[in-house]
Regions:
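NAD(P)H-binding glycine-rich loop region in Rossmannoid oxidoreductase-like domains
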Residues: 71-112
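NAD(P)-cofactor binding segment of oxidoreductase domains
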Residues: 100-130
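Adenosine-cofactor binding site in Rossmann-like domains, unifying the SAM/SAH pocket
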Residues: 58-76
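N-terminal Rossmann NAD(P)H-binding glycine-rich loop of SDR-like oxidoreductase domains
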Residues: 33-51
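Active-site "gating" loop of Rossmann-like NAD(P)-dependent oxidoreductase/epimerase domains
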Residues: 95-100, 134-155
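Mid/C-terminal beta-alpha module of Rossmann-like enzyme folds, strongest
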Residues: 225, 232-284
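NAD(P)-dependent short-chain dehydrogenase/reductase
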Residues: 167-216, 220-221, 225-228
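Amphipathic terminal alpha-helices
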Residues: 15, 21, 298-300, 308-321
Length: 321
């Protein structure tokens, strides 16, 4: 979906009353939400943050109960469950493996076909779907932050599968919400911060890419900031970007994490990362956008609060909080 077709689904065009529906908070009952992918990095954050909140009752489903690799069984798996919100935090995320024949097919099944089935099932019940996507739907040829109205043009199979999922979700209902995230990290699962700390502790030299720019995203803050938009007085719909500005390279992000760790007394073999161009790295089969910084202005306008700078989350990312 490129160019003009995408704009039919952007910025909440299909959302009732535009970008969001505001209701009297006193009239809004506690909602029941079914969560997929609750054992993952994002799903774990959603479970942790939402579990104690009075406005939502969270019902996690395991992969054994609903397997996205079997889209034709999704409707039966949801049969008999009552819910107001379906949250899809599950995905095929093996970016490089998606370039193989089997990986490409699996990515499209999970990220594309299954996402569409979930969207249709939720819409048929009058429920909302909260679905997550990625900055990898862009080709990286811009030199300013991508907005929700910018056309997509994924470079690899993973990004293409996520783009297809976005399209199918937004076609199914104007109430559904797709949130694009980038460089996700959090306490539920190891990600880049844990990798760079482990490498710096074990090796005298650690090479990190310096010519790819995006924005880190702290998963618990995603959960905290999204809850009012799906279970609060303002219901967000359509397409949203959420990440922590400003844009940075993996090198800059990793170096700042090491700086925090060093200041906290963590023993490291190297305290200074070595820059490397992404083209010089081996083992990356999938092309990646060189620039995929996303603009979060629409999120700020709907929620009433801008996303925090990623440096504010450095102590948590470095495991010091």
């Amino acid at each position: 979906m490129q160019g003009g077709r995408e704009k039919a689904f952007a910025v909440g065009v299909n959302c009732p009353h535009g970008s969001g529906v505001t209701a009297d908070p006193n009239d809004r009952p506690r909602i029941r939400a079914v969560l997929l992918g609750g054992s993952g990095l994002l799903g774990g954050a959603l479970r942790q943050v939402w579990a104690a909140r009075p406005e939502i009752e969270l019902v996690p489903l395991s992969r054994a109960e609903l397997n996205l690799t079997q889209p034709d069984r999704i409707e039966a798996a949801l049969e008999g469950l009552e819910f107001d919100l379906l949250v899809n935090a599950a995905a095929y995320t093996r970016v490089d493996d998606a370039e193989t024949a089997g990986g490409r097919e699996l990515a499209m099944t999970v990220n594309g076909e299954a996402a569409g089935r979930l969207a249709v099932c939720a819409a048929a019940r009058g429920a909302k779907l909260l679905h997550f996507s990625t900055d990898y739907v862009f080709d990286g040829r811009k030199d300013s932050p991508y907005t929700e109205t910018d056309p997509t043009n994924p470079l690899g199979a993973y990004g293409e599968s996520k783009r297809v999922g976005e399209e199918r979700v937004l076609e199914a209902s104007g109430r559904h919400l797709v949130v694009r995230l980038s460089w996700l990290c959090g306490p539920a699962r190891p990600a880049f911060p844990e990798w760079v700390l482990a490498q710096a502790a074990a090796r005298p030299e650690v090479r990190v890419v310096s010519d790819k720019l995006a924005c880190p995203t702290w998963a618990p803050d995603v959960a905290e900031r999204l809850l009012p938009l799906v279970a609060g007085p303002t219901e967000a719909c359509g397409l949203l970007h959420f990440c922590h500005p400003p844009g940075c390279s993996w090198l800059e992000w990793g170096q700042r994490i090491l700086d925090v760790a060093t200041a906290s007394g963590v023993e490291l073999q190297t305290r200074r990362l070595t820059p490397v161009a992404i083209a010089d790295l081996h083992g990356m089969a999938a092309p990646r956008p060189a620039y995929s910084v996303m603009d979060t202005g629409r999120f700020a306008a709907i929620s009433g609060r801008a996303a925090a700078d990623w440096t504010e989350w450095l102590p948590q990312m470095a495991g010091k909080v």
